[in-house]
């Protein structure tokens, strides 16, 4: 049986934590920053967890994660 391929796009966007949850970064920090409030930009810098509904799909993309 050949090895399963990791989806490289997903590998760059998601990290699996020690407990098996999946960490992701928030979008909206690349351009048009002047229009966004400082509070909003500060909140967007924090990482977030993938919700349980999407976790199963992301794990299929990261077979060795």
Curated annotation (Swiss-Prot):
Stored NCBIfam families: rpmI_bact
Coiled coil feature spans: none
Classification via PANTHER family: 54S RIBOSOMAL PROTEIN BL35M, LARGE RIBOSOMAL SUBUNIT PROTEIN BL35M
GO CC terms, sorted: cytosolic large ribosomal subunit
GO MF annotations, alphabetized: structural constituent of ribosome
Protein name as it appears in the record: Large ribosomal subunit protein bL35
Keywords from the named record: Ribonucleoprotein, Ribosomal protein
GO biological process, one term: translation
Pfam families: Ribosomal_L35p (PF01632)
Highest taxon, organism lineage: Bacteria
Lineage: Bacteria, Pseudomonadati, Myxococcota, Polyangia, Polyangiales
């Amino acid at each position: 049986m050949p090895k399963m391929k990791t989806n490289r796009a997903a590998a760059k966007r998601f990290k699996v934590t020690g407990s098996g949850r999946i960490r992701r970064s928030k979008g909206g920090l690349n351009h048009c920053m002047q229009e966004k409030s400082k509070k909003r930009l500060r909140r967007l810098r924090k990482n977030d967890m993938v919700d349980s509904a999407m976790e199963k799909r992301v794990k299929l993309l990261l077979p060795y994660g």
